[in-house]
Amino acid sequence: MMTMKGRTVSAALASKKKGEQSNRISPELPTFDTMSILSGSHPEPVAPSGPANLAAPLPRPLDPYRWRPEFPILQRKLDNGKPLVYLDNAASTQHPQRVIDAMSDCYQRYYANVHRGSHTLSGESTLALESARETCARFIGAASTHEVIFAAGTTAAINTVARAWGDWRITANDTILLTIAEHHANIVPWQQLAQRTGCKLEFLPIDDAGEIADDVVEEHLRRTRPKLMALTAVSNVLGTEYPVERWTRLAHQAGATVLIDAAQAAPHQPLDVKAWDADFVVFSGHKLCGPTGIGILYGKRELLEEMPPFLGGGAMIRTVTTEGFTTSELPTKFEAGTPPIVEAIGLAEAMRFVDDVGLDAIHRHEQQLAAAALRGLTPIEGLKIFGPPADRRGGIVSFVVEGGHTLDLAHWLDRRGIAIRDGHHCAMPLHQRLGVSGSCRASFYLYNTLDEVEALCAAVAEFHQRFIAKSRKRNPPSV
Ligand code: PMP
């Protein structure tokens, strides 16, 4: 049941009608008139006020054991009786009960399609959807809910920008600047745009620690004069945290529009889109304790207003005749068709949860886990760890065992209940730069513990001892 502080959406709707102030943690109520939502028109909402986060960070360090009981799946034992050690959070995170409850409460009590409905359930669902948008706007520090578009995820959001902004703005003479550390989601849509327009792609190189110096960025901006710089805030392989605020300033000075892929940042550190000042910021819900099928496309309002829509259909239009159409206002201009209603409700609840834990505390906790993993893995002979020191990375550690296959190591760990990811992690150009075809990746979140990191390091060391060191003794390399 979506009963934060005992309030359901119906109760919230009723109290809103009575003019009661919503409290911070309850599913927030839109600050615009309910009737206009029901009719499908979006008047100017009041800009969400206050800081980017919904609450101040916890003053004390994060205790994962405080939060683990809220995640039903973490109580699970695998078929071989091993407890689950879930270290695949960069791919997708797990869900606290309150997110599952918020979504099932909608399905069980007030689900209906949104906007334009004149019946009670449609009104309640619409209210919950638009309340969720307000929560998302607050979570990222957006100036207005007009700037918060519900997309299917990071990939869909980047493709929307590539189609809507890219097809409108990019010509054969233009250059798009990326980094070599991008996820395929932030490479392929631009390659497709290059196929359509003839524009050029340039890649910022990384150094051996997976970092990029400011002067490399400045030199590329000066030389290539890109129309767009699109970069990840945190590498999903190396864990490197790139200084997006500084680089956005440099890119703007060079006249470029900036897109930030925050898929590995938004769930793990406070995000303030106003401070970053990027033109577009995108991320997914399922890496933030939320459901799949939803993500956020943030765009600066002037830009979104000017841009043509990408997908056409219901909801994104104001009028349609046999001759043509006019578009609706933001944000629905970019939300053709039925939006991810229940997913938005789940995402908002996930954001409230993550905010209750405290994003500063989450960030510090993950850095401690990454530091512990680096300490535990570094002494293992023949292990190559990629990326920068712990103080400049998030909770992601990727490595290979020389002489061992990443798939064998992943299976070995899985038999011990430890879930990591192996392969290219949708970053083939980066792995090519690293000189390997794939890697093993352990990625942490708020519920992971130092004991789990120790279990990982011990199991990797045992794998090395059993399969690499022993076979070397039997067949020493010829000199
Ligand atoms: N960018 C980065 C940095 C990612 O880590 C991911 C997910 N691995 C994506 C984009 C794509 O996200 P999604 O699959 O949710 O669209």
Predicted regions and their residues:
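Pyridoxal 5′-phosphate
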Residues: 2-6, 12-16, 24-479
